[in-house]
A protein has these predicted regions:
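Extreme N-terminus nucleophile/cap motif
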Residues: 1-59, 204, 245-247, 253-258
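Conserved beta-strand-loop-short alpha-helix elements that form
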Residues: 2, 103-113
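Short acidic (Asp/Glu) patches
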Residues: 52-64, 78-100, 117-121
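Catalytic core of PPM/PP2C metal-dependent serine/threonine phosphatase domains
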Residues: 73, 149-190
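Glycine-rich phosphate/ribose-binding loops and adjacent secondary-structure elements
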Residues: 111, 179, 245
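Glycine-rich phosphate-binding loop plus the immediately following alpha-helix
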Residues: 113, 120-145
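Gly/Ser/Thr-rich active-site loops/lids in small-molecule metabolic enzymes
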Residues: 125-130, 190-213
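A conserved acidic, glycine/proline-rich C-terminal tail/linker
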Residues: 203-246
């Protein structure tokens, strides 16, 4: 399967430390060698970097590990292919426009017997993965349910998306990250965890490579940063492990739903 990584923060923050740990799982400490991608939000815009090769050997990944792109929301994914060939078009995260915002999505897991359920017309997949088709179906269902205008209150939208994720989970393993550039949603079938860092900040040590960071030297007392991952990335912090069917919604680093 694949691995997920995401971040929600109340100030523009770089994800160099966490991505350095994740990238090692793309061929060094893990078997996820079939591509990787990462999306950084900046206001209503975003920038996405992808590569169909292993993150541990990718020069583009080296850039992400060395150049601190600051963002309040980041979504990332390293791939171990099961549905769809190894190619750039099948590499997560996937992005679509809805209600004048870019929605970004990544999925870890594998689905079966899904083609009859995922009927879409407006949102079409470009590649041939179960993941991208599920994303298109979620957005199509949201538009059919809520209409063409973005609701003033987004809580019912994410509540509804959680019910859709429950349906998808009946078809297999569905761990999901989803963001509209404001909120970050995480849905768990079997492997997902998160940690929220706030003052007083301390040191953290990566599991997958010999890197230590002192967050007190990198942050201010007002910073709040939540990181979501398939498995804990550090060995000296208390990560919160989600249970099957759990979902969380974060805004500016804080838990707002779930």
């Amino acid at each position: 399967m694949c691995e997920l990584l995401a971040m929600s923060a109340n100030v523009p923050t770089d994800i160099v430390f966490s991505f350095t740990g994740l990238a090692e799982r793309g061929g060094v400490t893990g078997p996820h060698v079939d591509g990787w991608g990462i999306t950084f939000y900046e206001g209503k815009g975003n920038r996405t970097f992808k590569d169909a090769s292993a993150s541990s050997k990718s020069h583009i990944a080296d850039l992400i590990k060395s150049y601190p792109i600051k963002s309040e929301i980041v979504v990332s994914h390293i791939r171990q292919a099961n549905r769809g060939c190894v190619s750039l078009v099948n590499t997560h995260p996937f992005t679509r426009e809805l209600w004048g915002r870019y929605w970004t999505y990544a999925h870890n897991g594998q689905l079966s017997e899904y083609h009859d359920k995922f009927t879409v017309s407006r949102f079409q997949p470009v590649g041939d993965t179960d993941s991208e088709l599920a994303f298109c179906w979620i957005l199509e269902s949201v538009v059919n349910h809520f209409g063409e205008q973005e609701p003033e209150n987004m809580q019912p939208v994410f509540d509804y998306i959680a019910t859709l994720a429950d349906e998808i989970r009946e078809l297999g393993v569905f761990n999901m990250l989803l963001s509209n550039g404001i909120d970050l949603m995480a849905y768990c079938t079997n492997n997902l965890c998160h940690i929220t860092r706030r003052a007083p900040f301390g040191k953290a040590t990566l599991i997958d490579t010999d890197v230590v960071i002192d967050f007190s030297q990198e942050t201010t007392p007002n910073d709040v940063v939540t990181v979501i991952a398939t498995r804990p990335l550090t060995n000296n912090e208390n990560w919160v492990v989600l249970s099957p069917g759990d979902w969380k919604l974060f805004r500016k680093g804080e838990l707002v739903l779930g």
